[in-house]
Amino acid sequence: MAKGRKVINNHWVFDVKPDGCKCTHLVVKGFSQVEGIDFDQVFSPVVQFETVCLMLALASIGNWHIEGLDVRSTYLYGKLDEEIYMKQPKGFAVKGQEHKVLHLKYGLYGLKQAGLAWWETLNKSMKDLGFECLKSDASIFLYKRKGTTTVVAIVYIDDALFCGPDIKTIKEIKAAFMKHWECRDLGPAKEFLHMNIQ
């Protein structure tokens, strides 16, 4: 471990989702991170609520298809640039090596920079898939074929909507997206950011 580095503690969070699914998350106690040592930047863009409303209104006017998906464990995909060390999680410490620590390479929930690391990874992946990021809202991505926007992707942390006039193209794009991340395909979107979609 590098000199001057602090070891961050962690804890388990147990949760029951609205659908009854039981989840467990390992959460880093990021409040103990030191700015300038453990992280520099923490801001990560999220889609503006007004932009979501506008995009859904345009989709409604154009009679577009709207498909949803949920990216599982999003922050675990964000590659870290900083050196972060964490204590071994309770119940997973290696017997006889409890004094050793883990060097984190990817984000975990609770890290100050986890959201930014995920967004940077997502942004690069979307560009690799052929999307362009909207300049006015960094969580709206446009996919064009023959100069015409064919799919609009709206991403809010781990939730995404894919909207467009052609369901076949949307499904192709969704399938390509899901090759990059472990996702739960929600099919035709019924809800996004607590808004009902009909």
Predicted feature residues:
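Long, low-complexity, charge-biased intrinsically disordered regions
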Residues: 1-198
